[in-house]
């Protein structure tokens, strides 16, 4: 039986630094998030984290790019040596090929509330120090994408994930079972204001056993 889990990205209001053109546009932004109930492997405590991020999204002739880099700073409950909290860098990259643009007609796959169809490839990458687990996640992914006809963007993707990790507690890199993820990403401008409402939400299926033979959630 599949065990489902959800991850909700913190939606945020950000200052828009965009310059839009018919065939070339980009948006780069910085942000900060804070939470008090983060969890880490083999740690029963709720962990507080400050998360600083740099994000970039851009479009070109055949599709779009998305890059997000998070720096996560934990409190002392996420620490291996009872000192300062652990530090983590988490990188997300997605490249979506737009079938309409590739076909030379942006409206070739437009119907109803759907603006177009595409195919997304990318990866997640992290490295962490200061805690007992010290994750080194590597996760390429790929799958189809539906792009909805809204101001800004609203994309729904079904992605296949190939996740592996090589934590300090395991002698070699371990690969989990390939598993799917349903992901929703959006960036909606707020009228004439220089602000956008942005975020993401993931729904991830079970990835099988962990590196020690136990179940995953």
What do these predicted regions represent?
Residues 1-25:
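Cleavable N-terminal export/targeting peptides
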Residues 21-27, 57-66, 99-118, 147-157, ...:
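Short loop/turn motifs that connect adjacent beta-strands in outer-membrane beta-barrel proteins
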Residues 22-72:
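Short glycine/proline- and aromatic-enriched beta-strand/turn motifs that initiate or cap beta-hairpins
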Residues 28, 50-54, 89-93, 138-142, ...:
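Hydrophobic, lipid-facing positions within transmembrane beta-strands of outer-membrane proteins
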Residues 44-47, 75-87, 126-137, 174-176, ...:
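Solvent-exposed loop/turn segments connecting transmembrane beta-strands
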Residues 133-217:
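Detector for outer-membrane/organellar transmembrane beta-barrel domains
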């Amino acid at each position: 039986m599949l065990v489902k889990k959800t991850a909700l990205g913190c939606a945020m209001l950000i200052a828009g630094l965009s310059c839009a053109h018919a065939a070339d546009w980009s948006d780069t932004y910085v942000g900060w998030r804070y939470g008090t109930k983060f969890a880490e492997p083999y740690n029963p405590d709720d962990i507080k984290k400050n998360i600083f991020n740099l994000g970039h999204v851009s479009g070109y002739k055949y599709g779009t790019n998305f890059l997000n880099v998070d720096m996560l700073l934990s409190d002392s409950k996420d620490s291996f040596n009872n000192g300062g909290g652990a530090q983590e860098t988490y990188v997300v990259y997605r490249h979506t090929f737009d079938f309409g643009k590739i076909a030379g007609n942006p409206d070739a796959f437009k119907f109803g509330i759907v603006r177009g169809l595409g195919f997304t490839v990318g990866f997640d990458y992290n490295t962490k120090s200061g805690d007992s687990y010290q994750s080194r996640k590597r996760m390429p992914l790929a799958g189809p994408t539906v792009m909805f006809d809204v101001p800004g963007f609203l994309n729904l993707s079904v992605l296949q994930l190939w996740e592996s990790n090589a934590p300090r507690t395991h002698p070699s890199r371990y690969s989990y079972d390939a598993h799917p993820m349903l992901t929703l990403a959006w960036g909606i401008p707020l009228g004439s204001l220089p602000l956008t409402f942005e975020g993401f939400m993931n729904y991830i299926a079970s990835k099988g056993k962990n590196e020690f033979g136990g179940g995953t959630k």
